[in-house]
Amino acid sequence: MRKTVVDIIAMKAAGQKISMLTAYDASMSALLDQAGIDILLVGDSLGMTVLGYDSTVPVTMADMVHHMAAVRRGAPDAFVVGDMPFGSYQTGARDAVLNAMRLLKEGGCDVVKLEGGEVVCPVVKAIVDAGIPVMGHLGLTPQTAAVLGGYKVQGRDMEAARKLFADAKRLEEAGVCGLVLECIPAGLAEVVTASIAVPTVGIGAGKGCDGQVLVINDMLGLFEKFTPKFVKHYAQLAPLVRQGVENYIGEVRAGAFPEAEHTFTSSCDYKVLLSGDDQ
């Protein structure tokens, strides 16, 4: 049975930690769902992990709908959160509501997620008032990383911490059903988590959050350019993928693949086709 927003909020109340991972396609979403993941996040991180961009900014609504729909087809009963891409909610409440509706109707997600604090509260309220659950995102917000001075830890000084704390409270008042806290000191995340009734899901925010999220490509060791401090590799798949492909190339070039067990046969003598004597 598919989880609901009520179920996820109840996990916080019961002290049950929430597990969330990104997924971008049907095959991976099926595997993660089979493993028992609580939440699948179709993140705009797909811009870097799947589409080859150097940030999340170029990701479009069409990109998000395409990948969300694939994830939903792979895991029809999973609880799916979908990112609203940059530009889909910054132009006003009406645009935000229409785009959020599209993600639910065409993408099939259960909740939309957007970045920002007090400034996005009117948009959050408008989307929630339209009957669409919203998850917030504070701390390091990748869509506006350039304004923050790059991909850096946020909330280290008291002024920034006070603002983030206040933003979390305002987002809760605006109606969010959960909050991602990214790259902030563990102590700050713990205080924010204790101050709001909705679940917090951390990424680089310590153990004090109600749950944790990682990018699947990072967690499985598929991305080798760099490893953020907050990432733990639960597998190292990149070397295995390379080795498997190298083995395949070697066998193809040597004529060792395909073998008899991989080949279809027939009792027909097809060589007569070459002589034209098959009439």
From Swiss-Prot:
Domain of life, per lineage: Bacteria
GO (cellular component) term, any one: cytoplasm
Annotated Gene3D superfamilies: Phosphoenolpyruvate-binding domains
Record keywords: Cytoplasm, Magnesium, Metal-binding, Pantothenate biosynthesis, Transferase
Pathway annotation from the record: Cofactor biosynthesis; (R)-pantothenate biosynthesis; (R)-pantoate from 3-methyl-2-oxobutanoate: step 1/2
The keyword Mitochondrion belongs to this UniProt entry's keyword annotation: no
Binding site for 3-methyl-2-oxobutanoate: D44, S45, D83, K113
Enzyme Commission code: 2.1.2.11
Binding site for Mg(2+): D44, D83, E115
Cofactor annotation remark: Binds 1 Mg(2+) ion per subunit.
GO biological process: pantothenate biosynthetic process
Active-site residue list: E182 (proton acceptor)
Function: Catalyzes the reversible reaction in which hydroxymethyl group from 5,10-methylenetetrahydrofolate is transferred onto alpha-ketoisovalerate to form ketopantoate.
PANTHER family: 3-METHYL-2-OXOBUTANOATE HYDROXYMETHYLTRANSFERASE
Subunit structure, as described in the record: Homodecamer; pentamer of dimers.
Protein name, as recorded: 3-methyl-2-oxobutanoate hydroxymethyltransferase
